[in-house]
């Protein structure tokens, strides 16, 4: 089902994360059609609420069942040598998509895996914090990479359970690669500074503050990606000149159009 593109004798398979079912999927037209059908199955409103656990008749469980019936597995793990990590920006009819992309290469079978995650997502931000670790360099061997829903947390104000999405990134020794120290707290401080500045000028509208928060956190993590991570993977060394760009739009409407009630 994966897109394969010949590139210097190797094949590149593209992956993106669909957060409503919590599944890492191959990025291609066949997958996109299945995702669109699964969204119709549960309805737009239910889809936009995001991952809701796997108990009972949850939306995520229904979608996963439909995906499995159409050849898309619920769990995907990748491994290989880390050869690229960089900022990517794509313009589409419904906006500009700001992503982190990173590439693993399995030199034994000549296959490459290019993964795209939205910087606005918790999974994308966690991946950036891990790749910012000084121990991660070009050539670092990754024994296991996956993206999956984390533990739920209940918001008392809305009486809803929300799920962050997590990233597993294990090195050659099988140990989880740690987040770069301090980056998480620096991100919180950057967002607080932006929203506090707005509040100080009299803005207290929830929608305005949420937009400011989202913009601030994307800007912060983009800065970490561009200033700390990208220099570890110079493009001229990678030998990449845009040939690893997936064709067309993302498989799942990108960040899944989360509703405005998600707490920040």
Residue ranges and their predicted role:
Residues 1-116, 128-130, 151-198, 207-219, ...:
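OB-fold ssDNA-binding interfaces and closely related basic DNA-contact patches used
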Residues 73-79, 123-147:
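Short nucleic-acid-contacting surface segments enriched for D/E, G, S/T with interspersed K/R
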Residues 82, 104, 137-142, 264:
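Short low-polarity hydrophobic stretches
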Residues 115-123:
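Acidic, glycine-rich low-complexity segments with interspersed aromatic residues
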Residues 230-246:
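Intrinsically disordered, low-complexity mixed-charge segments
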Residues 246-264:
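Short acidic, low-complexity intrinsically disordered linear motifs used
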């Amino acid at each position: 089902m994966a897109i394969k593109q010949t590139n210097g004798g190797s094949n590149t398979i593209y992956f993106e994360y669909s957060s409503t079912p919590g599944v890492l999927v191959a990025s291609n037209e066949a997958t996109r059609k299945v995702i669109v059908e699964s969204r119709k199955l549960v309805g737009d409103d239910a889809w936009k609420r995001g991952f809701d656990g796997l108990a009972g008749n949850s939306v995520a469980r229904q979608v996963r069942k439909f995906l499995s019936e159409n050849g898309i597995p619920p769990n995907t793990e990748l491994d290989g040598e880390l050869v690229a990590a960089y900022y990517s920006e794509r313009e589409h009819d419904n906006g500009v998509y700001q992503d982190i992309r990173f590439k693993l290469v399995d030199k034994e079978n000549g296959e490459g895996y290019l993964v795209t995650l939205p910087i606005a997502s918790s999974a994308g931000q966690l991946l950036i914090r891990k790749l910012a670790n000084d121990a991660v360099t070009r050539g670092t061997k990754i024994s296991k990479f996956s993206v999956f829903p984390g533990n739920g947390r209940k918001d008392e104000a809305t009486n809803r359970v929300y799920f962050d999405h997590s990233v597993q990134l294990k090195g050659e020794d099988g140990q989880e690669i740690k987040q770069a120290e301090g980056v998480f707290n620096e991100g919180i401080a950057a967002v607080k500074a932006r929203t506090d500045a707005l509040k100080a000028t009299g803005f207290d509208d929830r929608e305005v503050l949420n937009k400011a928060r989202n913009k601030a956190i994307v800007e912060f993590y983009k800065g970490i990606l561009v200033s700390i991570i990208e220099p570890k993977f110079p493009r001229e060394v990678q030998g990449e000149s845009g040939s690893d760009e997936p064709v067309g739009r993302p498989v799942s409407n990108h960040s899944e159009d989360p509703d405005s009630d998600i707490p920040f």
